[in-house]
Each structure stands twice: as structure tokens, then as C-alpha cells.
Amino acid sequence: MAASTGYVRLWGAARCWVLRRPMLAAAGGRVPTAAGAWLLRGQRTCDASPPWALWGRGPAIGGQWRGFWEASSRGGGAFSGGEDASEGGAEEGAGGAGGSAGAGEGPVITALTPMTIPDVFPHLPLIAITRNPVFPRFIKIIEVKNKKLVELLRRKVRLAQPYVGVFLKRDDSNESDVVESLDEIYHTGTFAQIHEMQDLGDKLRMIVMGHRRVHISRQLEVEPEEPEAENKHKPRRKSKRGKKEAEDELSARHPAELAMEPTPELPAEVLMVEVENVVHEDFQVTEEVKALTAEIVKTIRDIIALNPLYRESVLQMMQAGQRVVDNPIYLSDMGAALTGAESHELQDVLEETNIPKRLYKALSLLKKEFELSKLQQRLGREVEEKIKQTHRKYLLQEQLKIIKKELGLEKDDKDAIEEKFRERLKELVVPKHVMDVVDEELSKLGLLDNHSSEFNVTRNYLDWLTSIPWGKYSNENLDLARAQAVLEEDHYGMEDVKKRILEFIAVSQLRGSTQGKILCFYGPPGVGKTSIARSIARALNREYFRFSVGGMTDVAEIKGHRRTYVGAMPGKIIQCLKKTKTENPLILIDEVDKIGRGYQGDPSSALLELLDPEQNANFLDHYLDVPVDLSKVLFICTANVTDTIPEPLRDRMEMINVSGYVAQEKLAIAERYLVPQARALCGLDESKAKLSSDVLTLLIKQYCRESGVRNLQKQVEKVLRKSAYKIVSGEAESVEVTPENLQDFVGKPVFTVERMYDVTPPGVVMGLAWTAMGGSTLFVETSLRRPQDKDAKGDKDGSLEVTGQLGEVMKESARIAYTFARAFLMQHAPANDYLVTSHIHLHVPEGATPKDGPSAGCTIVTALLSLAMGRPVRQNLAMTGEVSLTGKILPVGGIKEKTIAAKRAGVTCIVLPAENKKDFYDLAAFITEGLEVHFVEHYREIFDIAFPDEQAEALAVER
């Protein structure tokens, strides 16, 4: 620190700041640096910030520095006056032009000499910034990384032209220092002076201060750099006279002369622009301006009161003098700069030339900032209050816990956990081997730390182990009359299922105890397999639990995970016992025929232990790892088909067929169950919506021919929903659905004809089939593919082509039938060689539907013989049965479904294998009523039925 008569100079690394002695005295002989330290007499500072950057950081001396700097700026040039002014200014100018001599390694910090700001400086380097524009009289730190712009700014500083144009980019996401087009920036910006520049090699960090608003006129080309003087490396020390002449010559040149004229070819990046000063509109200090000014000052003070971030700096700036308040131009800029508004809103204030409008816009932004500050303060108070309450509650709880522990009123956490688990087991009959495990785990729990992972694993294991209802059973209902009433109330038909459940109750009543059973209901969808299980649970007074294994691929879903895994838990069976709180629930395992298989194992194999009455008394779950007795559980499984159920699993279950419904059964179910349920669901009563039996019959016949009643339920609900809409919309007070207006509710009929052929031509025979959806009629068509050529020489053997998306089994059945038909015809009519020499095409209609199975063998033989003889079979005849190569008719399945399908199609005569006689006679009387049935053992019997008028002589007719 060097002192003289009027001034004190603070020496930095590359420049000095000149302060008046009264200011140094006011600071007590010390000066605050930008880093917050104090500079004492005789010390140096390398701080890069000028004194005006310290506004609001120290005592009131900061305001004096600000006022002094403003005064010096208005005075024009370096701090004039005093004997050190010329020398200090010269040395600072040398430092500003040539950088820091002997600064050593590290970044070069250049502090520029304060100089007179030119009123007109049209050619400026362009710096594009984002987010916040620079307002006049405000300082901003800017970093520049673009190499071309860095070189340009270095050259301008060396030429004593530390002026730039700072403009805001339209796109805030653009981080580049330069732009490729003037359209990427707002054309109104700020003329700024570089007060300090820190050269970091690959980038520049500058402190710039805005002075006035400017507007871009056009883009300029960057002028080439002038060659340096030959005596560049000569010593810097010159005579005072030479230095004075150089300064006079430099000051005599107008700054605008240093810029080059633009050329037609402009660079790709905008580095230099021509600007013109923005002139404010003339204004008078009216009452409106005074009111806006006062409101801005009031709002700023309110923001300061709410947000301490603004308090020190803004108070210092406003206390420096009332000149700020009296200057509407500066006040509007300061108000906008204090806000965190959007960039386009701040730019709007910068571009506004009408001072009252600018004041109004600045006031709007300040009001938004004030509301945001109030919201932040409210949220802060709420969070602080919540934290205080939580902390206070925690302290009180800890104190209460200590007091209770001292008085013996509260036990340790581990003791409380052990007491809770033992309390659960008091009323249960726990097996000895399970109780030993519980005692061992409780002892282990007492030795573990409360916060260890093993503690939580052991506690969860004990929680599951003590939640099992050991020895707890629900009181079963053994009253046959009550059970039968419940089953009849919930379901219509299903006599086989009801009879089996009543038998189970009767056996339990005679034995005086109940045992678990494994039943499997299989049949088409929608016949009530799942719902009957719930009714059985209600009839037996057992708890009900259902889970589906359709698509299940993980064995752990059934048998649980090992406790060593994170997040391990028991399987579905143990979860069922915990939920039902009894050891004798009814467990429904749904969709057992659709169980999957994955890399985790085969769940169907895991069910073998579960569904084996000899093994499930000691079922071992992987998680519990103790045997659990499931012998009292009634397991019911459901499936659509039995083919996909593994044979060992099927062997463990008692299979009960739940067949589809005929039209009479569907009508009864709809009237007794579906329509009342749908009315209640739609909020209607019988007087509001009427559905007659004729409507339901037509609905079943033309819309719902499947075996189940699920689709019928949907159609009934659809009719009642539309009825409810008409009533609510005011179209009608009540709705009566008739066969004539049924299409208005459910659309066009889905089924318009009963069967494909009303009269079957030669070569066409009706067969019977059944699928998971129920029974159906199936026509077999045969036709001549290529004419018979009796005069052809060589091989005259015929052929058979089959189509209709047939499976492998059905294709084999067709080949067997073709061979047998040729042999049968050759045996009974040697003269008829039609099948031997002809090329025949066999087709089963509805080719998009896959078909498979052996039961169409006799139907194919009959169709081939009908084609060979050229005579149709008996009308209204349908048949099913597998044929062997010798003509023996083998039994098939699905007799009930096939019989129902035949009756639905209007068939009056059916042919069945003799071994299926018992299945047919098990059917209800209303199903077999009106049917002529023939049980056959050999195809010769079928031939006599299909062609009743044919004699042996007719077979010999040549075609």
C-alpha cells in the first residue's frame, strides 16, 4: 500500500485501485476484499473484484465506495485530482493494455483503467447470453469460450476498446457464446464496458457493466489484426515524454475509426455488429409516474422484508441516496433486475422505451416476485413448524420411554415382540415340533440387534409362523336338507356335482368327522364351475379361498421361497390359511388345465404333493420349513379340458364332468337367476323392464348358442342397460322387450340358420363334435376332384385329398376311413370301382377353425360311400364314432354335448357307438326326448341306417 497526500492506492496482482484517504479513514484503515477479508495497511490483495462489487458486503463504507465510483465515472477518466493521479492512471493503463507483467504462473487478471464512456460507439463485439439480460448500471460476470470471440476480445482490450454488446438469445437452451444468425437473438441489448478480464487460456471470465440500451443495425465482418511492432520485446519503460505523445495520439483517434468497414461476405458466426443507441421517449414526472415509482419502492421493501437474500445489497443501494428513487429510468431497471422472471419478460422491460410503461412492467414483475416470496415464506414456515413439532414429539417420546423404563411400566422392544407372538399362540393347538421352532427363533431374536437385517428376517418368520391357525377349524354343516337347499338356491341343474357334495356330507355325518377331498370340475366355459365352488363352501359352512394357476410358471407361488432370499414369503396355500384363519377351508384352484412351465420349475409337479391325500397331511412349505396338515382341506380344481392336465395329477383328482346346457336349461337359468340379477344391477324392477320367455328363447336361439350362459348374461345385461337409458332419457316410462323389437337392443342375429344343409346331397354327411366350448354339428363334404378315366393305361389307382385345417389325428382317421370304404365297397359291390379309380376331395367346412380327433371316422366312411353310390344319406341323421380298419365302431367322448348339439340342430336320429350306451342313458329325459338313437358295433349297422332303402343289388350299380 502506497500512501500520498490525497489518495491511497491498493495494489493488486496486476492493477491498483485508488481510494481517497477519507474513505480509508472511514474504514478504520482497512478495506474489505471481494472474498470477505480485510486489507490492512501495508498489505497487498490479489482480489480480482473492484470496490463497487462489494456493495452490501461490509459496513456502510460499501455505499461510500459505490457513490465514489459513480462520481468518478461521471467525472470521466481515472480518479482525477491529486499528485498520484497521473502516475496511477498511467500505470493502470499500462497494466490494462499489456496485462500483468511478472504475474507468474496461473490465470492472467487484467484490470482495465476507468475511462470516458463514448456517447456513440457503433461497432461492437457481440456476446450472446441466456436467461437474464444485462440492464444499464448493473454488473454481470460472463464467461466466453468461443476461440474466435476470445481472440477478438483480447485484441479489443489491447486496443483500449473494452466495449461489447450484450444481447439475449431467444432460445434459453442454446449454450453457445456466439450465434450464427441475428434471428437467434433479440435485437435490443446493452452497451457494456469490460471492467475486469481474467484470462484462463481456453476461456475468458469478464466483469462487464451495462451503460445504455443499443439496437442492432446489421452484422459486420471482423477486422484483421494489425501486425505488432518490431520492438515488441524491448523494455516497457519509456520516457514520460514518449508515453505522453503515444497517449495523445491514441486519444486523438475516434474509436469508430478502429473498426473496419463491412464486406459483402459475412462470416458464419456473428462476432461484430453495428449498433445504434436506443433513445427513450420524452416523459414528464406525472402523478402516475410518481405513484408507480412509490409502488415499486414499496414492493422492493416488501420483498426485502420477506426474502433476506435481497436485504443487505438492496438496502445499501437504496440508502446511498434518494437519487435512485427519483430516477424512474434506473428504478425500473433495478426493479426488473431484482426479479427471477422469465427471460422474455425481462427482455420486454429492456426493449420498452416508454418510461411509464416500463415502470408498469417492472412493477408487474415485482408483484409476481412478491407473491412468490410470500409463498416461499409460508412454505418455509410450515416446513419449519412441522420439523419443530416432529422434533418435539420425538424428544417427548424418548423422555417418556426413559421414564416408563425407569418405573418398570414399559418393556423392551424385544420383550414386547416376544409377548405379542406368545399371545397369538395361547388359544391355538400348536404341534410340538412347531413350538420347538418358535422357542428357538424367539431365543435367537433376543440375541440379535434391533437394526440388523437378520432381526427383521427372524421377526417376519415368527410373524408368519404364529399367524397359521394351528388346530383351529370352522364348524361344518352336516345337515343334508340345508346343504341341498343352498345348492338348489344358487345353481340350476348340475345334478352330478350336487349329488357328489351331498354324498361327502353324508359320509362325514356317519363318520363323525370330515376329511379333505380333491375334486376336479371340467367342462366348457360359462357353465358355473367356479361359482358352484363358492356355493359348496356356503353349503358346508367352510371358509372360501380361490387362486388361479393359469399361466403360472414359478413353483414358489405354490410352495414359497427360501428364507435366504430377500423379500421371501410363503406360497399361496400358507397365505390361504392365514387369511381364512382355519385349517379346513375350501380352496379353489382355478384353470388347472392351463398351468405353465418355466425355468423356475414345473408348478404342476408341485401340485402333486399338495393334491395327494396321502401326502398333504405333512405339506412342507419352503418358507415355513415345518410340516403343515392340509388333510382337512377340501380342494376343488376347475378345467375346460382334461387332455392338457398331466396324467399323474389327473390321477390324484376325482373328475366330475360339468356339461353344457340345452336351450330349456338356459331359459330356466335366465328366468331364475340372470334376469333378476341384471335388473338389480341396472336399478330396474319388473314393472319398468319386461322380458318375456319368448324374448329369452329367441335370444338363446339366435344369439347365444354356446354351452355356457356367460354370453347370455351379457346379452340380458345389454338389453336392460338400453332399457334403463330409454327410461332415464325420457323416451319411455317403461320398456317392454318383444321378439319384434329385440334387434333394437342387441343388433342383428348372429345365427340365422340351424345348419348348413337342410337337405344333404350325395357325398355330404352330418357328424357330431365337441370342444371346450361345447358340442356342435360338423358336416363332412366329399366331391370328385378329377374325372374317372377308365380308358387310361397304366396305374388307375385313385387318391384322397383332405382340407379344412384338420389335425394329425383326424387326417389319420380320414385315411383309415378311405381304406375301409374302398374295401367295404369292393367286398359288397365288386363292380363299383369308383373309390379305386377316382381322385376325391374331402373337406370339412369352416376351414379357419382347427379340427382334430378320431370321432369322425364313421362319418367320413358314410360320405365316401354316398359319393360312390351317388345317393344321399337319410335326412336328419347325425353320427359319431371312431372306425377301425376292420369296420369296428369304437367309443368316443362328449356324448352329452354332442346329443345337445344334435337336438339343437333339429336332428331326429343319431348313431352312437354301442360302448357309449351308458353315457347316453345318464342324460336327462328332456335332452333325449324325441331322439331316435341307434347303438352300433360295426359299420355294417350304420350303412343299413344311413341307406335304408338300398339293397345289395344297388351297391353293384356302376357309375
From Swiss-Prot:
Residues 77-102, 218-257 are annotated as: Disordered. Peptidase activity is subject to substrate inhibition by ATP. GO terms for cellular component: cytosol; membrane; mitochondrial matrix; mitochondrial nucleoid; mitochondrion; nucleoplasm. Changing W770P: Has normal basal, but low stimulated ATPase activity, and abolishes peptidase activity. Residues 1-67 form a transit peptide. Residues 759-949 form the Lon proteolytic domain. Residues 233-243 have a biased composition (Basic residues). One of its GO terms (biological process) is proteolysis involved in protein catabolic process. It is an enzyme of class 3 (hydrolase). PROSITE patterns: LON_N (PS51787), LON_PROTEOLYTIC (PS51786), LON_SER (PS01046). Residues 124-370 form the Lon N-terminal domain. Changing K529R: Abolishes ATPase activity, and presumably ATP-driven protein unfolding, but does not block access to the proteolytic active site or prevent a substrate from binding to it. It is found in: Mitochondrion matrix. It catalyses: Hydrolysis of proteins in presence of ATP. The active site is at S855, K898. InterPro entries: AAA+_ATPase, ATPase_AAA_core, Lon_bac/euk-typ, Lon_lid, Lon_proteolytic, Lon_Prtase, Lon_prtase_N, Lon_prtase_N_sf. GO terms for molecular function: ADP binding; ATP binding; ATP hydrolysis activity; ATP-dependent peptidase activity; DNA polymerase binding; G-quadruplex DNA binding; identical protein binding; insulin receptor substrate binding. Changing W770A: Has low basal, but normal stimulated ATPase activity, and retains peptidase activity. Duodenum, heart, lung and liver, but not thymus. SMART domains: AAA (SM00382), LON (SM00464). ATP-dependent serine protease that mediates the selective degradation of misfolded, unassembled or oxidatively damaged polypeptides as well as certain short-lived regulatory proteins in the mitochondrial matrix. Endogenous substrates include mitochondrial steroidogenic acute regulatory (StAR) protein, DELE1, helicase Twinkle (TWNK) and the large ribosomal subunit protein MRPL32/bL32m. MRPL32/bL32m is protected from degradation by LONP1 when it is bound to a nucleic acid (RNA), but TWNK is not. May also have a chaperone function in the assembly of inner membrane protein complexes. It is linked to CODAS syndrome: A rare syndrome characterized by the combination of cerebral, ocular, dental, auricular, and skeletal features. These include developmental delay, craniofacial anomalies, cataracts, ptosis, median nasal groove, delayed tooth eruption, hearing loss, short stature, delayed epiphyseal ossification, metaphyseal hip dysplasia, and vertebral coronal clefts. Homohexamer. Organized in a ring with a central cavity. The ATP-binding and proteolytic domains (AP-domain) form a hexameric chamber, while the N-terminal domain is arranged as a trimer of dimers. DNA and RNA binding is stimulated by substrate and inhibited by ATP binding. Interacts with TWNK and mitochondrial DNA polymerase subunit POLG. Belongs to the peptidase S16 family. This is Lon protease homolog, mitochondrial. It comes from Homo sapiens (Human). The gene is LONP1.
